[in-house]
């Protein structure tokens, strides 16, 4: 190798070595700087990731806002469409046609309109309200209208689908009956609501005046609840129950059932109780004989409330009551129409002072009882404490056939009435049970009742009540027993029970004792010292059940020992409670 090439080679190697060393140093520097660069890149990656997440959240928020805006715009469009739609008309459904159309009454005229496919006309009733669109097609079905005019059914036409109505000023018109009112059909006299535009009867209205006056409830009173009236109960059973229980036997003898019964007598002696017990007992007896469940109907007519200031209203209500009774009787069940305070409605014609109302009311009742339309399975029972005021035509045979006097209770009847209220279920004082009954509560009650009745019916000076002077100059002493009644006996027992309750509350003994009953009698007599007050002596005598010579003067004997010896003319004082 030439000598001159050696330095050049060494120089080249040196340069190459330097370059390699430089490259090594660069690589070492890069290796040393790599972790910091990695950390920087990681930090930058985190920043970019956070920015991306923020951008995504913004995008989601913008998307949600955009969706809300779209929905709001859609709602606004729907509202605008609703506001710009033409109004829907209402109509009354009349009938369906074979071609799928329907007849409706709307805007004062009858129209044949199309029906939306989703509406089933078979389920739509006549008289229902329908909604029509701008093309007068039925798009919806509603219930019947709830407002209209009130009218009264005068007559029922066809099969009950049409009726003749009486409206304002007795104007008559023919109207169609809505489908839901045709079964059961309307009856003559029913109060209904009618749509005057379509002449459609939409609703049957209750008649409060008739519903309140004639109650169809069957009372739960039995003959066992009535004490001291065994003879009267037997008479009314013979008159009412036998004709219904043995129809064939009565038919063999050609003996018609009585049409009516009059229960008369002083107030508070059980007239209304007997009438209630009749309805209850009659249904049970008929059920036993026939073997089928029978419900009797008791139409309780409150006499004074039937009176009406408008001419003909009282007569109309009497007709409605008997019409209802006939409808119930057609089912083959007994119906009792009970007129309480009968003298207030059916007074003797011509006896009115300020009106002649009775001149039309009495004939209406007579026509209902034995007119052209015979009463079958219907019994009229009247109750009154002034039977002398009732028109004689009502009391004649063939109308109110049976007349039963409900008298004031005697001593035996009083014992039976007391026994209805003083029963072993009522707490009795333990001392009385031991002393009077020897440990037997029922025996103690019997002794208490016996002594109470003896005190109540004694004709001693402490029981003297009135001295009455008759027109012929005779005088008579009346005792409290002459004015006793079942209501008075019930009130005495109530007072005794109240005394026992107050004594037990105060820490005393429990139960009723004899002293409670005796104290109650004294208090009852004390409170009724003004019992005979009346403006007319004859009225007092008749209502109290004492008939005969006219009473012209009376004086109270209850407090005579206290210096009140003077009498008082009864014309100067007000009407009393019981008499």
From Swiss-Prot:
One of its GO terms (biological process) is proteasomal protein catabolic process. Residues 578-579 are annotated as: Docks into pockets in the proteasome alpha-ring. Disulfide bonds: none annotated. One of its GO terms (cellular component) is proteasome complex. Pathway: Protein degradation; proteasomal Pup-dependent pathway. Residues 8-86 form a coiled coil. PROSITE patterns: AAA. Residues 1-21 are annotated as: Disordered. Keywords: ATP-binding, Chaperone, Coiled coil, Nucleotide-binding, Proteasome. The keyword Lipid metabolism does not apply. Pfam families: AAA, Prot_ATP_ID_OB_C, Prot_ATP_ID_OB_N. Belongs to the AAA ATPase family. ATPase which is responsible for recognizing, binding, unfolding and translocation of pupylated proteins into the bacterial 20S proteasome core particle. May be essential for opening the gate of the 20S proteasome via an interaction with its C-terminus, thereby allowing substrate entry and access to the site of proteolysis. Thus, the C-termini of the proteasomal ATPase may function like a 'key in a lock' to induce gate opening and therefore regulate proteolysis. Consists of three main regions, an N-terminal coiled-coil domain that binds to protein Pup and functions as a docking station, an interdomain involved in ARC hexamerization, and a C-terminal ATPase domain of the AAA type. PANTHER family: AAA-FAMILY ATPASE (PTHR23077), PROTEASOME-ASSOCIATED ATPASE (PTHR23077:SF144). Homohexamer. Assembles into a hexameric ring structure that caps the 20S proteasome core. Strongly interacts with the prokaryotic ubiquitin-like protein Pup through a hydrophobic interface; the interacting region of ARC lies in its N-terminal coiled-coil domain. There is one Pup binding site per ARC hexamer ring. Upon ATP-binding, the C-terminus of ARC interacts with the alpha-rings of the proteasome core, possibly by binding to the intersubunit pockets. This is Proteasome-associated ATPase. It comes from Acidimicrobium ferrooxidans (strain DSM 10331 / JCM 15462 / NBRC 103882 / ICP). The gene is arc.
């Amino acid at each position: 190798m030439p000598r001159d090439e050696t330095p050049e080679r060494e120089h080249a190697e040196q340069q190459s070595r330097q370059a390699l060393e430089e490259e090594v140093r660069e690589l070492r520097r890069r290796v040393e700087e790599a972790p910091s660069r990695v950390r920087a890149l990681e930090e930058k990656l985190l920043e970019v990731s956070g920015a991306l997440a923020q951008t995504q959240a913004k995008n989601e928020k913008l998307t949600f806002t955009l969706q809300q805006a779209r929905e709001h715009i859609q709602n606004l469009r729907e509202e605008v469409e609703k506001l710009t739609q033409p109004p829907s008309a209402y109509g009354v459904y009349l009938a369906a046609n074979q071609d799928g159309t329907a007849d409706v009454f709307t805007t004062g005229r009858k129209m044949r309109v199309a029906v939306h496919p989703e509406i089933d006309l078979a389920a739509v009733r006549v008289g229902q309200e329908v909604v029509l669109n701008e093309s007068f097609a039925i798009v919806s079905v509603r219930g019947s209208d709830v407002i209209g005019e009130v009218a009264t059914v005068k007559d029922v036409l066809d099969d009950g689908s049409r009726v003749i109505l009486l409206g304002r000023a007795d104007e008559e018109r023919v109207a169609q009956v809505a489908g839901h009112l045709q079964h059961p059909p309307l009856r003559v006299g029913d109060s209904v609501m009618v749509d005057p535009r379509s002449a459609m009867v939409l609703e049957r209205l209750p008649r409060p005046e008739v519903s309140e006056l004639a109650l169809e409830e069957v009372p739960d009173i039995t003959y066992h609840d009535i004490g001291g009236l065994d003879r009267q109960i037997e008479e009314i059973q013979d008159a009412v129950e036998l004709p219904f229980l043995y129809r064939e036997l009565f038919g063999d003898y050609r003996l018609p059932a009585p049409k009516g019964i009059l229960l008369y007598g002083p107030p508070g002696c059980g007239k209304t109780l007997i009438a209630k017990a009749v309805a209850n007992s009659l249904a049970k007896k008929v059920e036993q004989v026939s073997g089928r469940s029978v419900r009797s109907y008791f139409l309780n007519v409150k006499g004074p409330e039937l009176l009406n200031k408008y001419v003909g209203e009282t007569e109309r209500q009497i007709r409605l009551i008997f019409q209802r009774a006939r409808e119930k009787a057609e089912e083959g069940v007994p119906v009792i129409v009970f007129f309480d305070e009968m003298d207030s409605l059916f007074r003797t014609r011509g006896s009115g002072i300020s009106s002649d109302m009775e001149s039309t009311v009495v004939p209406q009742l007579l026509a209902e009882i034995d007119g052209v339309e015979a009463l079958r399975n219907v019994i009229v029972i009247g109750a009154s404490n002034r039977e002398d005021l009732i028109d004689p035509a009502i009391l004649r045979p063939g109308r109110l056939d049976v007349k039963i006097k409900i008298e004031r209770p005697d001593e035996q009847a009083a014992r039976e009435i007391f026994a209805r209220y003083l029963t072993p279920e009522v707490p009795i004082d333990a001392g009385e049970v031991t002393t009077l009954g020897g440990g037997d509560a029922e025996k103690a009650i019997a002794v208490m009742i016996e002594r109470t009745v003896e005190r109540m019916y004694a004709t001693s000076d402490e029981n003297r009540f009135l001295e009455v002077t008759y027109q012929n100059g005779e005088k008579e002493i009346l005792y409290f027993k002459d004015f006793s009644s079942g209501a008075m006996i019930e009130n005495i027992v109530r007072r005794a029970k109240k005394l026992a309750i107050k004594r037990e509350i105060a820490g005393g003994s429990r139960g009723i004792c004899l002293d409670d009953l005796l104290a109650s009698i004294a208090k009852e007599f004390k409170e009724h010292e003004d019992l005979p007050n009346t403006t007319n002596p004859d009225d007092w005598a008749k209502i109290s059940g004492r008939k005969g010579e006219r009473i012209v003067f009376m004086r109270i004997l209850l407090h005579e020992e206290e210096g009140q010896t003077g009498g008082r003319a009864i014309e100067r004082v007000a009407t009393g409670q019981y008499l």
